[in-house]
């Protein structure tokens, strides 16, 4: 029997727009509207609008919310103020990654966790199995839609729809009940593209109206609706990990290069702390590195990588970078094959093609 794909509240809108949809973790989502490269360049140069409503939202509330979360996540939530967000990971005892997530502090007893779509149920089960005391978990994923407006002109586009001075919401800060075109929104200065921008959490029933308002407001600025294809090439160029590729139960946050989100010295003990502390102190045995192809070919997820004839790892993500026009990839490689300018080989369809280790991120926006 065929499993029915899940749809976001905006499905009808992108169906009408002629978007090409794909199965993404059980969701029927647009891969592109007008073309991946066109959408990618719109975000790098102007702005793009994404439907990210497949992401999960979990409220964690109560007097014991903070202590419970501190024991689950790798970053230090005690450093957060109200209306501040923080990038985080949850790990197993051995240091593998359960998921990467954003934690929003609404107040000292109320947090919003944003989870990867494919992991919503397993994450909630993991959290539920590890919390105790006065804490409640409320899954609000189905009633919450999430739109992302990203790019150098994102703020200007959104400012036309609200009286709220959006420039006052600093990166990784958020404000609740901001009115955009008379729709109440939680507006967060976060994103997954390497550009400035906002993520807008809204009631599912208001999502279509907000989408239309942003598209109309963005037209004079060159804003385009964007699909998963551009979202992936954008995050890849900025070296932002994708769960299931750069991060898995077998790959730690340290190996994946997000050690900044792992505070092994925070006062609260957390799951995976000892394993991650050891990796930080001794250096991980594997590292995520960037490669650029020397020979012609595109490194794709799962391709094996060789150094001096030895298998040293695999490609986690790879593509022809729309911004650079080069064939580049991210590789989880043994540490002794990870130095910049190291010559590697990628096995592409049975042939070993030359590549070299390069600095990442492949793209960094100028402030």
From Swiss-Prot:
Gene3D superfamilies: Aminomethyltransferase beta-barrel domains, Aminomethyltransferase fragment, Probable tRNA modification gtpase trme, domain 1. Signal peptide: none annotated. One of its GO terms (molecular function) is aminomethyltransferase activity. Keywords: Aminotransferase, Transferase. The keyword Transferase applies. One of its GO terms (biological process) is glycine decarboxylation via glycine cleavage system. Its EC number is 2.1.2.10. It is an enzyme of class 2 (transferase). It catalyses: N(6)-[(R)-S(8)-aminomethyldihydrolipoyl]-L-lysyl-[protein] + (6S)-5,6,7,8-tetrahydrofolate = N(6)-[(R)-dihydrolipoyl]-L-lysyl-[protein] + (6R)-5,10-methylene-5,6,7,8-tetrahydrofolate + NH4(+). One of its GO terms (cellular component) is cytosol. InterPro entries: GCS_T, GCS_T_bac, GCST_C, GCV_T_N, GcvT/YgfZ/DmdA, GcvT/YgfZ_C, TrmE/GcvT_dom1. It comes from the Bacteria. Belongs to the GcvT family. The glycine cleavage system catalyzes the degradation of glycine. The glycine cleavage system is composed of four proteins: P, T, L and H. This is Aminomethyltransferase. It comes from Shouchella clausii (strain KSM-K16) (Alkalihalobacillus clausii). The lineage of its organism: Bacteria, Bacillati, Bacillota, Bacilli, Bacillales. The gene is gcvT.
């Amino acid at each position: 029997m065929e499993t029915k794909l899940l749809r976001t509240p905006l499905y009808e809108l992108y169906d009408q727009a002629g978007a090409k949809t794909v199965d993404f973790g059980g969701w029927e989502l647009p891969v592109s509207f007008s073309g991946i490269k066109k959408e990618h360049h719109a975000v790098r140069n102007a702005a793009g609008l994404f439907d990210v409503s497949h992401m999960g939202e979990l409220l964690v509330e109560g007097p014991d919310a903070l202590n419970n979360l501190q024991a689950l996540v790798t970053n230090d939530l005690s450093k957060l103020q109200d209306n501040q967000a923080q990038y985080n990971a949850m790990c197993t005892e051995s240091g593998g990654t359960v998921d990467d997530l954003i934690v929003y502090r609404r107040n000292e007893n109320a947090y919003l966790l944003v989870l990867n779509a494919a992991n919503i149920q397993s994450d909630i089960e993991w959290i539920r199995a590890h919390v105790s005391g006065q804490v409640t978990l409320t899954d609000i994923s189905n009633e919450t839609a999430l739109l992302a407006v990203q790019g150098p002109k994102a703020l200007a586009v959104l400012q036309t729809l609200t009286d709220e001075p959006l420039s006052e919401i600093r990166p990784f800060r958020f404000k609740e009940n901001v009115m955009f075109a008379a729709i109440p929104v939680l507006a967060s200065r976060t994103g997954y593209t390497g550009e400035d921008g906002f993520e807008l959490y809204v009631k599912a029933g208001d999502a279509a109206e907000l989408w239309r308002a942003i598209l109309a407001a963005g037209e004079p600025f060159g804003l385009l609706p964007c699909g998963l294809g551009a979202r992936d090439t954008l995050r890849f160029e900025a070296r932002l990990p994708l769960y299931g590729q750069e991060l898995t139960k077998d790959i730690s946050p340290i190996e994946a290069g997000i050690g900044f989100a792992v505070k092994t010295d925070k006062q609260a003990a957390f799951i995976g702390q000892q394993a991650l502390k050891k990796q930080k102190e001794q250096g991980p045995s594997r590292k995520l590195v960037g490669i650029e192809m020397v020979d012609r070919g595109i490194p794709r997820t799962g391709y094996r990588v060789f150094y001096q004839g030895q298998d040293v790892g695999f490609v986690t993500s790879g593509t022809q970078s729309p911004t650079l026009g080069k064939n580049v990839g991210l590789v989880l490689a043994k540490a002794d094959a990870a130095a910049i300018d190291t010559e590697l080989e990628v096995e592409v369809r049975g042939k070993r093609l030359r590549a070299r280790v390069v600095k990442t991120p492949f793209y960094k926006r100028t402030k």
